[in-house]
Amino acid sequence: ALPPELVKPFTQARSIMDGHTPQILQLTLARFMEDGHYNSHIRAMRKLYAGRREIMLEAIEQHLQGIVRAARPEGGLQIPCFLEPGWSEEHTLRRALSAGVQLPGLSRLYIGEEKQQGWLLGYASLTAYEIESAMLRLANALRQGKG
């Protein structure tokens, strides 16, 4: 590890050295795009994420019915889930964390008086197994902590 007194000088030196992208990398990326590889990559990622989104929506429907109502997003990598009446965002976030599922709350994203309660569920980096496992753990933690 770098001694604390050297962190700032090294950070400044590194920012000077890395101030621009080398031409060879720019040319490589240009060729990658010209040859259609970028578009191919985008198509593959859209297909991958659409599949994960469907798996997440199915898992929400199967395990969290009566707790949240999921909105089907047209894009993005997160699913907004709105809490059903009788469920508190603060309480559900604590219960989720106790089950090893960290969720951002929806209410903090709203300006004004009428804030929706719920969470955002991300799926970009998760496998089908991880999605199913997380939704099952989350549902169990929420249902056990309801009373």
Place the predicted regions along the sequence by residue.
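PLP-dependent class I/II
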Residues: 1-147
